[in-house]
Amino acid sequence: MFPLVKSALNRLQVRSIQQTMARQSHQKRTPDFHDKYGNAVLASGATFCIVTWTYVATQVGIEWNLSPVGRVTPKEWRNQ
């Protein structure tokens, strides 16, 4: 009995999903803000971040201290 009920429910769910998709595909919806401007907002935000970090990394004068090799000399060890 269980497989029969399960298959009936699956068919019912598939049909309802198919009907919903068919209903949605026939509707004409107007584009919202994200449809109109989403890609432009994303591209301008990415450009702003890249330009800002490029300026900070190259022009502000931050000492980044990437590697101490060749700049750090060990102090002489003193016996006490």
Curated annotation (Swiss-Prot):
GO terms for molecular function: cytochrome-c oxidase activity. Residues 60-80 are mitochondrial intermembrane. It comes from the Eukaryota. Residues 1-24 form a transit peptide. Signal peptide: none annotated. It is found in: Mitochondrion inner membrane. The chain crosses the membrane at residues 33-59. Residues 25-32 are mitochondrial matrix. Its main location: mitochondrion. The keyword rRNA-binding does not apply. GO terms for biological process: cellular respiration; central nervous system development; mitochondrial electron transport, cytochrome c to oxygen. Keywords: Membrane, Mitochondrion, Mitochondrion inner membrane, Transit peptide, Transmembrane, Transmembrane helix. InterPro entries: Cyt_c_oxidase_suVIIB, Cyt_c_oxidase_suVIIB_dom_sf. Pathway: Energy metabolism; oxidative phosphorylation. GO terms for cellular component: mitochondrial inner membrane; mitochondrial membrane; mitochondrion; respiratory chain complex IV. It is a single-pass membrane protein. Belongs to the cytochrome c oxidase VIIb family. Component of the cytochrome c oxidase (complex IV, CIV), a multisubunit enzyme composed of 14 subunits. The complex is composed of a catalytic core of 3 subunits MT-CO1, MT-CO2 and MT-CO3, encoded in the mitochondrial DNA, and 11 supernumerary subunits COX4I1 (or COX4I2), COX5A, COX5B, COX6A1 (or COX6A2), COX6B1 (or COX6B2), COX6C, COX7A2 (or COX7A1), COX7B, COX7C, COX8A and NDUFA4, which are encoded in the nuclear genome. Component of the cytochrome c oxidase, the last enzyme in the mitochondrial electron transport chain which drives oxidative phosphorylation. The respiratory chain contains 3 multisubunit complexes succinate dehydrogenase (complex II, CII), ubiquinol-cytochrome c oxidoreductase (cytochrome b-c1 complex, complex III, CIII) and cytochrome c oxidase (complex IV, CIV), that cooperate to transfer electrons derived from NADH and succinate to molecular oxygen, creating an electrochemical gradient over the inner membrane that drives transmembrane transport and the ATP synthase. PANTHER family: CYTOCHROME C OXIDASE SUBUNIT 7B, MITOCHONDRIAL. It is linked to Linear skin defects with multiple congenital anomalies 2: A distinct form of aplasia cutis congenita presenting as multiple linear skin defects on the face and neck associated with poor growth, microcephaly, and facial dysmorphism. Additional features include intellectual disability, nail dystrophy, short stature and cardiac abnormalities. This is Cytochrome c oxidase subunit 7B, mitochondrial.
